[in-house]
Amino acid sequence: MKTLILAAGLGKRMNSKYPKVIHKIFNKPMINWVIETAKNFGKVAVVLGHKYELVKKVIPEDVEIYLQNQQLGTAHAVMSAIEFVSPNDNLLILYGDVPFISHETLKRLEKEHVKSNSDVTILTSILENPTGYGRIVRDGKIRIIEDKDATEEVKKIKEINTGIYIIKGNFLIENINKIENNNTQKEYYLTDILKFTDNISTVTTNDVDEITGVNNRIQLANLEKKIRRKINEKLMNQGVRIIDPNAVYIDPQVKIGRDTLIYPFTFIEGETEIGEDCVIGPLTRIKESKIGNKVTINRSEVEKSVIEDNVSVGPFARLREGTTLDENVKIGNFVETKKSSIGKNSKAQHLTYLGDATIGNNVNIGAGTITCNYDGQTKHPTYIEDNAFIGSNNSLVAPVKIGKNAITAAGSTITNNVPENSLAIARQKQINKENWVLRKGGQKNANNKK
């Protein structure tokens, strides 16, 4: 089965300079959610129109693109891509602004289409308030009557047309050009193709959210809120403790182990995996990261990092791309890491920057330590081997290596390698000038200024 995604609309109600279908839901353009689902069934094509150059940038290379130069209705959009369809194909019609249509529902639709050998199979739904939707009328044959054309009796029908169809390729090719624009909008509607056949079947979905389209920013926010609630409830049913599901933001592809506790105002995004018995949050953001078991992350930001078991992070830490923390590592308040690996049982608990650093096991990084990794043109590495002790307020000027069991004294600026089992002191000798303040009258003058 092939899929054609219609995404040429103007999206005026979004009141945006960007096309509607590239607005993001869960940090991904909404059209990409549709494309990913459609790829489960075979080849995919999209019909673009309004500002297509911007939409084209987010379309995968293996998806064919067709242009609808004028937006003259859904049937006209399909006409624009008719060469994508062969007579032996079944064509699934989807929409770029209906992002959460599920694979399971489309699989049922495909199964019914093949089983019934219908010319057209329609996905329908039941709405308590169907106002605005075309109604499915069953009076010996299946028809769609638009809301504006419906009698009071027809308006009582709650089964609606979602606009999602599977159509036989040969039937579509033979009849698409027969559709006329005899309506007030002077547009060509794909629903009119049903006039040319009685061989129609239907499948109904009870999940209204999966067939909900996005027309404005309020609908975008409301739909995302509903989907987030479902995501959180699914995780809770799988054994995750979420204290306040209304204040936790988790993307659909995130995986979280049992007995992990999520505090409010936590954002977990992208292809993130979190193990069991973790404590995450509050006020924490984790993106595209892999986290082991029994990890605590408190009021911190983690991006594209790997954290092994029994690690503690935060509060107010930032793990940037390329960070790897081995088992039992402790990263404390106001510590930042980037492209660095930190070995087992090592600690950096206060006011530290570690960039392009490789740190061994059982290393202690003193408060105020900085790896000076950038010379204005090039990044340089720092190596700290097992059991080293880095004193407080150290500047490690890369490239530099601290050997096993070595110690650097507090306040040092380390510019050369430190051998194993050595103590490095790189600071000026302290000089105390006795009674200097009294001789200069400094203290008296200072007091007079108060």
From Swiss-Prot:
Cofactor: Mg(2+)
UniProt-annotated binding residues for UDP-N-acetyl-alpha-D-glucosamine: 6-9, 20, 68, 73-74, 95-97, 134, 146, 161, 215, 320, 338, 353, 364
InterPro entries the UniProt entry points to: Bifunctional_GlmU, GlmU-like, GlmU_C_LbH, Hexapep, MobA-like_NTP_Trfase, Nucleotide-diphossugar_trans, Trimer_LpxA-like_sf
Annotated active site: H350 (proton acceptor)
EC number(s) given by UniProt: 2.7.7.23, 2.3.1.157
Pathway: Nucleotide-sugar biosynthesis; UDP-N-acetyl-alpha-D-glucosamine biosynthesis; N-acetyl-alpha-D-glucosamine 1-phosphate from alpha-D-glucosamine 6-phosphate (route II): step 2/2; Nucleotide-sugar biosynthesis; UDP-N-acetyl-alpha-D-glucosamine biosynthesis; UDP-N-acetyl-alpha-D-glucosamine from N-acetyl-alpha-D-glucosamine 1-phosphate: step 1/1; Bacterial outer membrane biogenesis; LPS lipid A biosynthesis
Catalytic activity: alpha-D-glucosamine 1-phosphate + acetyl-CoA = N-acetyl-alpha-D-glucosamine 1-phosphate + CoA + H(+); N-acetyl-alpha-D-glucosamine 1-phosphate + UTP + H(+) = UDP-N-acetyl-alpha-D-glucosamine + diphosphate
UniProt keywords, alphabetically: Acyltransferase, Cell shape, Cell wall biogenesis/degradation, Cytoplasm, Magnesium, Metal-binding, Multifunctional enzyme, Nucleotidyltransferase, Peptidoglycan synthesis, Repeat, Transferase
Record region (N-acetyltransferase): 239-450
Role according to the record: Catalyzes the last two sequential reactions in the de novo biosynthetic pathway for UDP-N-acetylglucosamine (UDP-GlcNAc). The C-terminal domain catalyzes the transfer of acetyl group from acetyl coenzyme A to glucosamine-1-phosphate (GlcN-1-P) to produce N-acetylglucosamine-1-phosphate (GlcNAc-1-P), which is converted into UDP-GlcNAc by the transfer of uridine 5-monophosphate (from uridine 5-triphosphate), a reaction catalyzed by the N-terminal domain.
Protein name (record): Bifunctional protein GlmU
Taxonomic placement: Bacteria, Thermotogati, Thermotogota, Thermotogae, Thermotogales
Gene from which this protein is expressed: glmU
